[in-house]
């Protein structure tokens, strides 16, 4: 997930209008049952963009009813050929490609994401992911099993049913596609709750769902708050599975609610405090650049952020020097402004949390190399910050910061750094930089993380499974493994008169 250039960027639209602000159920737009709305803001200017209908339990109930009806045996969705499901997903990808400029602009304006990153990275990723999922629709298959006796046995990989999907604010459109793509490819129906900070692109995609020709009730989108709409999804007795991307704290609540209700299936992609280990024999320029983007991409608002950099003692000072030099190159500003290379944090809550953690680093004895405070008079901007001389017991070395703050630690031996890297509740991802293949394989095997990148960082594609160890979640998204999360395996055994080999 490295920053992109701007050479291929189309000119921003000057007349952007937000068309879709209502709840989407059964391919129709609805006001909230309560009549409530909530404001949506631009984090770069703190200005209100619009008011969106606020869904809660009553609206979730309506959406689940529609999704359940669409999933009934004999429904248009259940009787549709798998290849036709794939065709609908291809069509949706084409429509997103058609509206790519509009969606990227909206993502930047509502989420504080650099326009170049939104257009070149996020939208490109969404389109590729949908097409990948579309191709899988008619390739999800069971097996025949040669059991003992005069029987014919086979397995079916069936859709789970109604899936609740709760989307985070840091990658609103990407995570929406990660959720609905595999679910729909497998034949499920979905009830989606986008993050309250960033619901706009999901609601626009809802209009494209209808335009693509998905039957009513297959996709339903209910904007609202976590403690109301999100909790209603997690605890709903007629939702068969819930998938969530977000904080570990909220992930625990979702898993608890799933267990206390109907034991619905759960997939969680949660927080991280990912280690990045740089050995003395590494290509230093490459390591500095990947480690830098690993933590500063999207203002540090990434679950995979390389937020613990362990550098071998002999190259530590030079690594710090180059990292500080690189961090000082940022131009902060409105992410829609040409030339800006760092945008704002998503909201004041996150902004205050990041600044508090920066202050803790100063007080606990880390050396502030650059940054260390807010920027500007308006918007939630934080200076790119680098700390050296960080030790493992400091808050900035243990807690997920979710901001543009790099911690650089020193190590002497491989055994020591592996123990320190694994000494965390999290286990989402990790990086290793070395030119020694033996060390690369040894360290990669020892690290407790769902993804390990060697001599690179943040390479995430639709073909690869993604997910965490330990308290970074459970289950996998994307890749062939990701489709397993959206099917139930059924064994069917038929008595026959005679079995032949």
UniProtKB/Swiss-Prot annotation:
Metabolic or biological pathway, per its Swiss-Prot or TrEMBL entry: Cofactor metabolism; retinol metabolism
N-acetylserine carried by residues: 2
Modified residues (N6-acetyllysine): 91, 128, 252, 353, 367, 410, 419, 495
EC primary class: oxidoreductase
Molecular function via GO: 3-deoxyglucosone dehydrogenase activity; acetaldehyde dehydrogenase (NAD+) activity; aminobutyraldehyde dehydrogenase (NAD+) activity; benzaldehyde dehydrogenase (NAD+) activity; retinal dehydrogenase activity
Signal peptide: none
Pfam families registered for this protein in UniProt: Aldedh
A Gene Ontology BP annotation from the UniProt entry: cellular detoxification of aldehyde
Keywords: Acetylation, Cell projection, Cytoplasm, Lipid metabolism, NAD, Oxidoreductase, Phosphoprotein
Function summary: Cytosolic dehydrogenase that catalyzes the irreversible oxidation of a wide range of aldehydes to their corresponding carboxylic acid. Functions downstream of retinol dehydrogenases and catalyzes the oxidation of retinaldehyde into retinoic acid, the second step in the oxidation of retinol/vitamin A into retinoic acid. This pathway is crucial to control the levels of retinol and retinoic acid, two important molecules which excess can be teratogenic and cytotoxic.
Protein name: Aldehyde dehydrogenase 1A1
Gene name linked to the record: ALDH1A1
């Amino acid at each position: 997930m490295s920053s992109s250039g701007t050479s291929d960027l189309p000119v921003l639209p000057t007349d952007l209008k937000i068309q879709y602000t209502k709840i989407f159920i059964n391919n129709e737009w609805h006001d909230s049952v309560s009549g409530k709305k909530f404001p949506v803001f631009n984090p770069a200017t703190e200005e209100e963009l619009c008011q969106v209908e606020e869904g809660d339990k009553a609206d979730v109930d309506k959406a689940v009813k529609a999704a359940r009806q669409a999933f009934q045996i004999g429904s248009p969705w259940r009787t549709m050929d798998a290849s036709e499901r794939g065709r609908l997903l291809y069509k949706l990808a084409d429509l997103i490609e058609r509206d790519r400029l509009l969606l990227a602009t909206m993502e930047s304006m509502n989420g504080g994401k650099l326009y170049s990153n939104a257009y070149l990275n996020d939208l490109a990723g969404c389109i590729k992911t949908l097409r990948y999922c579309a191709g899988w629709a008619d390739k999800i298959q069971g097996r025949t099993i040669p059991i003992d006796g005069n029987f014919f046995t086979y397995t079916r990989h069936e859709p789970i049913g109604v899936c609740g999907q709760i989307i985070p604010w840091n990658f609103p459109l990407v995570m929406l596609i990660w959720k609905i793509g595999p679910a729909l490819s497998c034949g499920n129906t979905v009830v989606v709750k986008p993050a309250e900070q960033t619901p706009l692109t999901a609601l626009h995609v809802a209009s494209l769902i209808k335009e693509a020709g998905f039957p009513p009730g297959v996709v339903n989108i209910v904007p609202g708050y976590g403690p109301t709409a999100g909790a209603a999804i997690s605890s709903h007795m007629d939702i068969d599975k819930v998938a969530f991307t977000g904080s570990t704290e909220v992930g625990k609540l979702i898993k608890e609610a799933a267990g206390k209700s109907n034991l619905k299936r759960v997939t969680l992609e949660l927080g991280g405090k990912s280690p990045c280990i740089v050995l003395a024999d590494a290509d230093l320029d490459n390591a500095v650049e990947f480690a830098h983007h690993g933590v500063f991409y999207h203002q540090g608002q990434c679950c995979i952020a390389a937020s613990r950099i362990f550098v071998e003692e002999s190259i530590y000072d030079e690594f710090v020097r180059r990292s500080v030099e690189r961090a000082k190159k940022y131009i902060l500003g409105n992410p829609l402004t040409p030339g800006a290379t760092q945008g704002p944090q998503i909201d004041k809550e996150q902004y205050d949390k990041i600044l508090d953690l920066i202050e803790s680093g100063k007080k606990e004895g880390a050396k502030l190399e650059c940054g260390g405070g807010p920027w500007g008079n308006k918007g939630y901007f934080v200076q790119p910050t680098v700390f050296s001389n960080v030790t493992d017991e400091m808050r900035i070395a243990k807690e997920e910061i979710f901001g543009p703050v790099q911690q650089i630690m020193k190590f002497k031996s491989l055994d020591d750094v592996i123990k320190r890297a694994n000494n965390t509740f999290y286990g989402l991802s990790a990086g290793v930089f070395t030119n020694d293949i033996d060390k690369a394989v040894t360290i990669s095997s020892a690290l407790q993380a769902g993804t390990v990148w060697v001599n690179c960082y943040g390479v995430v594609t639709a073909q690869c499974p993604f997910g965490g160890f330990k308290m970074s979640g459970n289950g996998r998204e994307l890749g062939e493994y990701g489709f397993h999360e959206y099917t139930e395996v059924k064994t069917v055994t038929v008595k026959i008169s005679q079995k032949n080999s």
